[in-house]
Amino acid sequence: MRITSAIASLLLVGTATSLQNPHRRAVPPPLTHRSVASRAVPVERRSNDFEYLTNKTARFLVNGTSIPEVDFDVGESYAGLLPNTPTGNSSLFFWFFPSQNPDASDEITIWLNGGPGCSSLDGLLQENGPFLWQPGTYKPVPNPYSWTNLTNVVYIDQPAGTGFSPGPSTVNDEEDVAAQFNSWFKHFVDTFDLHGRKVYITGESYAGMYVPYIADAMLNEEDTTYFNLKGIQINDPSINSDSVMMYSPAVRHLNHYNNIFRLNSTFLSYINGKADKCGYNAFLDKAITYPPPTPFPTAPEITEDCQVWDEVVMAAYDINPCFNYYHLIDFCPYLWDVLGFPSLGFGPDNYFNRSDVQKILHVPPTDYSVCSETVIFANGDGSDPSSWGPLPSVIERTNNTIIGHGWLDYLLFLNGSLATIQNMTWNGKQGFQSPPVEPLFVPYHYGLAELYWGDEPDPYNLDAGAGYLGTAHTERGLTFSSVYLSGHEIPQYVPGALTASWSSCLVELIVFPRRGTTPLNFS
């Protein structure tokens, strides 16, 4: 089946009632105003019986009641530096949060941010950690949608030179990254006695390079004592060339969202003409068909005259000086941000650059920045995009891979991910054989009822959205999930959708949901 408009492949929801508000289909009409008596609450982690506290781990223990600015007990966690030797010559910083979920006793989940050179503490503090301090908020708050409610999670700054991990970097390509990471991971497993645990690797953005290469190296070890890999998830990932991920989809995406961009008709005519002339639209029309075409089209070259993404972004700044390509619906003023990312307005300080924060995390005085100015790859990343290399093999060997993408990301585009998938061959076939249009449903929860009646939920961020939030399509061990209202960081913008998605990966089945998307209480 051919779909001539690239965006159209995800606009089709495939239901007879598509004109009905999809967010209300599963909601019965209210009868009377009633209070919600029973409510789920965020996990309160106040036990002194720390499961992972041993003589080996005591030096990493973080006092969960003394984290600066955090006025609640974060519970058991461990942070510090472990060596990445023998393949590396430095150490990597980690912050490990055990879960109170009894179903998580035999697994460990790894979270990696991208960059290259961006700290995974960004993911912890503003996306899926047990406490959040997101842009525009006054102070840290508990995160009812923390992934630690589902599983044990470790956030790692890697490669060396990223975040709290001391440099200089000595990696030249993704094979070096994987070798140094897996050397570090063996030290981590030995320290916390995690031998034989099921391992899941997750991340976003440039982690679309990191995760498949690390996963491939783990599987190649054939050593389930340390590398019992069971699945991966990569969101808004860098998995192909810039031509496919950024430039070919840029103008089609602008057209779809120009009610937000509000660029004038003269510019639209000019930039659409350039996209046609450069071959971007023709490439998408051929690439995003189901099943994929044979032969598959070659992505256009990015010449000096074909840098359409750059021109769109420059024009967007003229209309909206606070345009944020990580989340294209941001407007002025910038939200102040303790990290300065992904909101572009810096706050009064850099939280992780504070000496009291660094002391409690057991790191030496460090000039921390969320995305390091240190060069990670001195001569550029020498590896091919992961979709050309290890990603298809990882899909085949785990049969449990999720690629997620937010529609409101204007840096790496969902149609870039789709075009990439259609050019990959795994488990005997190339690409998806049918369009990825099945709706992703996230269950409703009590907090939304409080909002309906005008009550103030407690805590407010409990009220992540519910209903039909995107699409989720699975073929031959690969799931592609799109999220309508998310930018580059899905756990930050639409936590319920990402929690549902990751919950499915943990049981090696793509079923929505498994452990739930409402706040969990295992106490």
Swiss-Prot record:
SUPFAM superfamilies: alpha/beta-Hydrolases. Its EC number is 3.4.16.-. Transmembrane segments: none annotated. Residues 19-52 form a propeptide. Glycans are attached at N55, N63, N89, N149, N264, N353, N399, N415, N423. Changing H488A: Impairs catalytic activity. GO terms for biological process: proteolysis. It is an enzyme of class 3 (hydrolase). Keywords: Carboxypeptidase, Glycoprotein, Hydrolase, Protease, Signal, Zymogen. Residues 1-18 form the signal peptide. Removes acidic, neutral and basic amino acids as well as proline from the C-terminal position at pH 2-5. Belongs to the peptidase S10 family. PANTHER family: CARBOXYPEPTIDASE (PTHR11802:SF116), SERINE PROTEASE FAMILY S10 SERINE CARBOXYPEPTIDASE (PTHR11802). This is Carboxypeptidase cpdS. It comes from Aspergillus phoenicis (Aspergillus saitoi).
